[in-house]
């Protein structure tokens, strides 16, 4: 297929048109008074959203070169969302502003490579300045404020996320689901829970709830199948003498072994229950080891030279209670040493940082949460499915922003942080590098200007007021139209969101500025289909 090539300013100008069209669609969602965007779906009701990345993902342009420009900035929004969970609109607005300002200078004769170098130096200095003006998150009030802002000023969502994080801790897993009603709900599973239920209903101790409830049980962990009762007898006799209940977690228990355990339970000889070990393969071994560390026990493993017959009561873990239903097992207050649990948590965090697989990362985070203290489930309620999707998007954004804030700290929000950080940066660059740095500094006003514009205020006046202020916490509250102390007003942003948005925006804008040619396929207009054969109509002449 024939290709079309554009060079120099012509190529960059067409790329800019695509970036501008994407930015114009995304920027309207910015700030507390940002507007919604209605997105047509191939089937079903249209999607209403105020989420920048959701808008960006839907933008596909007819012109091939314009679409290339738009797709690069779309990647900025997606990458920012993946890394920080929020700041997608900020990243898009910054990328557009940097490219626009840079294009003007490159067209006027500036060297794009030198300009890029100056931009990179300015960004590195700005990130250090951001860290210097940041504060650590000190309590659930600030967590609620961050979540509220990210959820488009919805205080109920902010409170819900703050409550969830308070209950499960910063490393706990918080999942978002759709509720069956119009009310938002928060439920918390304390302790370690895994998705394996009892092996026999005869183990049930609470018939009303159809649950097995064990108080202060011993916990035996074995990584193979148990089919022969003879191997179990030594440890069973020791547990019976202690008078405590026993939970067996093994790959499987079947045949004679399971039947004998059930008979002993029914006769009241031993209060016992059994479940399959969670996970598969290497993940199962890791989870058994997690349970062992949490409960202060040991995994009886033939790989370590241990047989089930050699197990003693000293190898067993303990917990204050265990609850088992047909689908799940929950271990509460394991007797493991805190230092051992903390060491295991550190090890899992290191594995999360190293892994490149999203699936492995998700599973490792689940394990981390189970060791750290629980899982919280936020159930989002709404009157219609369309509203539910929009609200769920906002809760996901707010949750990610909150995690980012806990991780790297907070700065003033409302688009002011980058402007305030730039006041302490003075690199004294020369030539085209200085132009690159100035391009970034000018672009830093764009998010604040857009927030003010969306709220119906004069963008230039607002940006100038923040820029000339001597107060390090000064900013503009677009919801009320007042200049305030941003920390006192609770208008705060995570440092990570600002940092990632700036880095990604400059990265793609500098790539676009240093583009000297574009190559794309020529779209060929499809020929009109031929008229159908009018055979048989010729005989109409005889009708005259």
From Swiss-Prot:
It comes from Campylobacter concisus (strain 13826). GO terms for cellular component: cytoplasm. The keyword Nucleotide-binding applies. PROSITE patterns: CHAPERONINS_CPN60. Keywords: ATP-binding, Chaperone, Cytoplasm, Isomerase, Nucleotide-binding. Its EC number is 5.6.1.7. Together with its co-chaperonin GroES, plays an essential role in assisting protein folding. The GroEL-GroES system forms a nano-cage that allows encapsulation of the non-native substrate proteins and provides a physical environment optimized to promote and accelerate protein folding. This is Chaperonin GroEL. Forms a cylinder of 14 subunits composed of two heptameric rings stacked back-to-back. Interacts with the co-chaperonin GroES. It catalyses: ATP + H2O + a folded polypeptide = ADP + phosphate + an unfolded polypeptide. GO terms for biological process: protein refolding. PANTHER family: 60 KDA HEAT SHOCK PROTEIN, MITOCHONDRIAL. It is found in: Cytoplasm. Gene3D superfamilies: GroEL, GroEL-like equatorial domain, TCP-1-like chaperonin intermediate domain. Belongs to the chaperonin (HSP60) family. ATP binds at residues 29-32, 50, 86-90, 414, 477-479, 493. GO terms for molecular function: ATP binding; ATP-dependent protein folding chaperone; isomerase activity; unfolded protein binding. Its main location: cytoplasm. CDD domains: GroEL (cd03344). It is an enzyme of class 5 (isomerase). SUPFAM superfamilies: GroEL apical domain-like (SSF52029), GroEL equatorial domain-like (SSF48592). It holds the Pfam family Cpn60_TCP1.
């Amino acid at each position: 297929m024939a290709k079309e090539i554009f060079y120099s300013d012509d190529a960059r100008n067409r790329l800019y048109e695509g970036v501008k069209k994407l930015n114009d669609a995304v920027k309207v969602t910015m700030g507390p008074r940002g507007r919604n965007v209605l997105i047509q779906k191939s089937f079903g009701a249209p999607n209403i959203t105020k989420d920048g990345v959701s808008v960006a993902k839907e933008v596909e342009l007819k012109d091939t070169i314009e679409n290339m420009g738009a797709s690069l900035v779309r990647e900025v929004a997606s990458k920012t969302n993946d890394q920080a969970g929020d700041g997608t609109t900020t990243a898009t607005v910054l990328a557009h502003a940097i490219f626009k300002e840079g294009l003007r200078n490159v067209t006027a004769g500036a060297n794009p490579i030198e300009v890029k170098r100056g931009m990179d130096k300015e960004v590195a200095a700005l990130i250090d300045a951001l860290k210097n003006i940041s504060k650590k998150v000190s309590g659930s009030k600030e967590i609620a404020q961050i979540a509220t802002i990210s959820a488009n000023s919805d205080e109920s969502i902010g409170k819900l996320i703050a409550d969830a994080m308070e209950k499960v801790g910063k490393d706990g897993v918080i999942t978002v689901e759709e509720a069956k009603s119009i009310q938002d709900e928060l439920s918390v599973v304390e302790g370690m829970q895994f998705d394996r239920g009892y092996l026999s209903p005869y183990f049930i101790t609470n018939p009303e709830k159809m649950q097995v409830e064990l108080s202060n049980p011993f916990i035996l962990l074995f990584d193979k199948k148990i089919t022969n009762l003879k191997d179990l007898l030594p440890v069973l006799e020791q547990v019976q003498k202690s008078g405590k209940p026993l939970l067996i977690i093994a790959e499987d228990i079947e045949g004679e072994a399971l039947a004998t355990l059930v008979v002993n339970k029914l006769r009241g000889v031993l209060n016992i229950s059994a479940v399959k070990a969670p996970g598969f393969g290497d993940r199962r071994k890791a989870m058994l080891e997690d349970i062992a560390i949490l409960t202060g026990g040991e995994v009886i493993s033939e790989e370590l030279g241990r047989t089930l017959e050699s197990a003693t009561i000293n190898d067993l873990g303990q917990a204050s209670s265990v609850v088992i239903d047909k689908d799940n097992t929950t271990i509460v207050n394991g007797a493991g040493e805190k230092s051992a649990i903390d060491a295991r948590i550190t090890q899992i965090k290191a594995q999360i940082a190293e892994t490149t697989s999203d699936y492995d990362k998700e599973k490792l985070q689940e394990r981390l949460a189970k060791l750290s203290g629980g899982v919280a489930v936020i159930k989002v309620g709404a009157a219609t499915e369309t509203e539910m999707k929009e609200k769920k998007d906002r809760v996901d954004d707010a949750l990610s922003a909150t995690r980012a804030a806990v991780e790297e700290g907070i700065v003033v929000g409302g688009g002011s942080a980058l402007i305030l950080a730039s006041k302490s940066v003075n690199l004294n660059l020369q030539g085209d590098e200085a132009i690159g740095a100035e391009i970034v500094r000018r672009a830093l006003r764009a998010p604040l200007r857009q927030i003010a514009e969306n709220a119906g205020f004069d963008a230039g006046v607002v940006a100038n007021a923040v820029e000339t202020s001597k107060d390090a916490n000064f900013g503009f509250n677009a919801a009320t139209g007042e200049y305030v102390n941003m920390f006192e007003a609770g208008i705060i942003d995570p440092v990570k969101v600002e940092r990632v948005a700036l880095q990604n925006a400059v990265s793609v804008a500098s790539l676009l500025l240093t583009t000297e040619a574009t190559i794309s396929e020529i779209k060929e207009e499809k020929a009109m289909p031929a008229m159908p054969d009018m055979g048989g109509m010729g005989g109409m002449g005889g009708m005259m």
